[in-house]
Amino acid sequence: MSAGWVAGAVRAKALVGRYPGAAGAREVAACDRLGDALRCLAATPYSRYARTAVGLPEAQRAVTATLLWHLRVLAGWLPRGGARLLVPLAAGFEIANVASRLPAPGGRRAESPQPYRLGALETAWRSLEHAATPGELRAALVASPWGDPGGDTPWALVTGMRMAAARRTAVAVPPARRWAQGRAVLLTAREQFVHQRSLLEPAQRHAARLLGGRASAAASYQEFR
């Protein structure tokens, strides 16, 4: 192992060691009031952003922004080219950026937070952020490593990106394959058995590669299980 990878491994262990872990997460979840939860976070690395949170959306954003910041820090410690392993793991932040630009249910556009700053962990955000319509977003995705989501409706764009991210994670980071498969299971089940709509072809293809053809083509929840 090169010195660069050793430095990255040491940094990763240091970051993990500072986090509250499962016990801390349960403690925060058990808080009756947001103020109590924020006080719990104040003693953790999440305080970097949580100290200015005044409501639940801001607190949630503080937690995710801290995670992204530490992924970017870790990427900076890895040797040249090593950050590519973290790009699929940061895909959710790019998806959130895209989702915030899409019309909310009913056609209205909700107030959007500032986009996450991805730095070296972006997949294609610098192209996607200039898209003014769902059709332009789809075209930008087609021309990027994300690939075609199969449609330009908000649900098609976001679901297509999420399934593509699961597939990319499984390929680029083999130890995370089970996480990626779990994500694909939840996405497939939600679309087919909650919303009663079939996955579009690109997402269906990714799901089949992750879960097998029988699961992705199941006609009932019992068969899917």
Describe the function of each predicted region.
Residues 1-225:
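N-terminal domain-start signal
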